[in-house]
Curated annotation (Swiss-Prot):
Pathway: Amino-acid biosynthesis; L-arginine biosynthesis; N(2)-acetyl-L-ornithine from L-glutamate: step 2/4
HAMAP family: ArgB
Site features described as Transition state stabilizer, chain residue numbers: K29, K250
Gene that encodes the chain: argB
Main location: cytoplasm
Protein name: Acetylglutamate kinase
Record keywords, A-Z: Amino-acid biosynthesis, Arginine biosynthesis, ATP-binding, Cytoplasm, Kinase, Nucleotide-binding, Transferase
Length: 295
């Protein structure tokens, strides 16, 4: 009886959020341990299905770095990283596309469909969904000339074809996007999944952008979770060195999404079961939320 009462309390607490998000788009970047652990995979799929059932329009953008790494190792193709990004030559690009588009994407689509959704797998090449160009990286070091790093076919997003996504949403489908883009000449690019998720969220005018990670959220210099930030305070964390490593591109894409009109961006711990529902539909949420600074 107590358990039933608790469940009822949770549903009542969630009701205002169901109303708030009904008809809205939420973009979720799916990656990390949530893509590997079987119980977390099942929970994620059910979270996405429930979003759809209560009137939310979820869009999933996924990563797949570990899967790419394993396939490159099996094929004896050497891997090189610069500034946290995989240097992508032609052979590596072929493997990236094969793994992300041909395997990981289809596994996620199948999981969602078996859980009761209508999911459709896409890459950025489908309908020129994700337009891209080669990423230019220049590293400046004190007392040294700037270093230009050639990352090969690593790209950055230049545009998103929203008509395709809107059409799928109107017909009740959940888009699942592999972070592979294409330029005007048909060249294929490997793009950081966080950056694709942020660009898609901004282009769609999403209400929320959620990035699933393997950490609790943004941490201060003492390792404590920062639950809420605005853009001004976030820029201070860039400047004082609090943000570093893999958190840098995540926060960067959050700020760009907010600038493009997304209401809130969240960095949450994908290792927590039902993390998507806990973030969106409870009073306290989890992880770190970033909002635009008050003018």
């Amino acid at each position: 009886m107590q358990n039933d009462a608790f469940k009822s309390k949770v549903l009542i607490e969630s009701l205002p959020y169901f109303r708030q998000f009904s008809g809205e788009t939420v973009v979720i970047k799916y990656g990390g341990n949530a893509m590997i652990d079987e119980s977390l995979k099942q929970a994620f799929a059910l979270n996405i299905v429930l979003l759809k059932y209560v009137g939310v329009n979820p869009v999933v953008v996924h990563g797949g770095g570990p899967q790419i790494g394993r396939m490159l190792q099996q094929l004896n193709i050497p891997t090189n990283f610069r500034e946290g990004l995989r240097v992508t030559d032609d052979a590596t690009m072929d493997v990236v596309e094969m793994v992300l588009v041909g395997k990981v994407n289809k596994q996620i689509v199948n999981l969602l469909n078996l859980s009761g959704a209508k999911a459709v797998g896409l890459s950025g090449k489908d309908g020129q969904l994700i337009r891209a160009r080669q990423m230019e990286m220049v590293i400046s070091k004190e007392a040294q000339a700037p270093e230009i790093i050639d990352l090969g076919k690593v790209g950055e997003v230049t545009g998103v074809e929203t008509k395709l996504l809107h059409s799928l949403q109107r017909d009740g489908f959940i888009p699942v996007i592999a972070p592979v883009g294409v330029d005007e000449n048909g060249e294929t690019y490997n793009i950081n999944a966080d950056l694709v998720a942020g660009a898609v969220a901004g282009a769609l005018g999403a209400k929320r952008l959620l990035l699933l990670t393997d950490v609790p959220g943004i941490l201060d210099k003492d390792g404590r979770l920062i639950s809420s930030l605005d853009t001004a305070r976030t820029m201070q964390l860039f400047e004082d060195g609090t943000l570093k490593g893999g958190m840098l591109p995540k926060v960067k894409c959050c700020l760009e999404a907010l600038e493009d009109g997304v209401e809130k961006a969240m960095i949450i711990d994908g290792r927590i079961e039902n993390c998507v529902l806990l973030e969106l539909f409870t009073d306290h949420g989890i992880g770190t939320e970033i909002t635009r600074a008050c003018s």
